[in-house]
């Protein structure tokens, strides 16, 4: 069993770059743990950019010893709020958004083991 080390960041030092870097590091640690546990395959990475702002890293493991397929994806996107959201939120000035996180999906080889999906 592999343990996941949590790195604590003081709230006073949190900004969007610090938070995104934390999630990228978490993605690295999760992928390393899954690869080590599976033992039969490694992740392939695809980096992408969002024209409106931000981007991410998609990582896929296929045909492993335990997992048929697994994806661990990181994204950090930003930009101006859509006009409908501006109206819905009842804001008068131009507002930007920032969203980041990790999405994980795993499909085991064994059909009796449940699929895993989490964000």
What would you call each of these model-derived segments?
Residues 15-90:
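Gly/Pro-rich turn-and-neighbor structural signature
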Residues 1-13:
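N-terminal amphipathic/basic-hydrophobic helices that include classical n-h-c signal peptides
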């Amino acid at each position: 069993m592999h343990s996941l080390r949590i790195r604590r960041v003081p709230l006073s030092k949190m900004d969007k770059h610090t938070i995104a870097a934390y999630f990228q590091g978490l993605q690295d640690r999760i992928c390393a743990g899954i690869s080590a546990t599976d033992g039969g395959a490694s992740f392939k990475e695809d980096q992408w950019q969002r024209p409106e702002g931000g981007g991410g890293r998609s990582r896929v493991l296929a045909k492993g010893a335990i997992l048929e397929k697994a994806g661990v994806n990181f994204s950090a996107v930003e930009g101006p709020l859509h006009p409908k959201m501006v109206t819905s939120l009842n804001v008068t000035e131009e507002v930007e958004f920032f969203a980041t996180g990790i999405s994980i999906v795993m499909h085991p080889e064994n059909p009796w083991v449940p699929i895993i999906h989490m964000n």
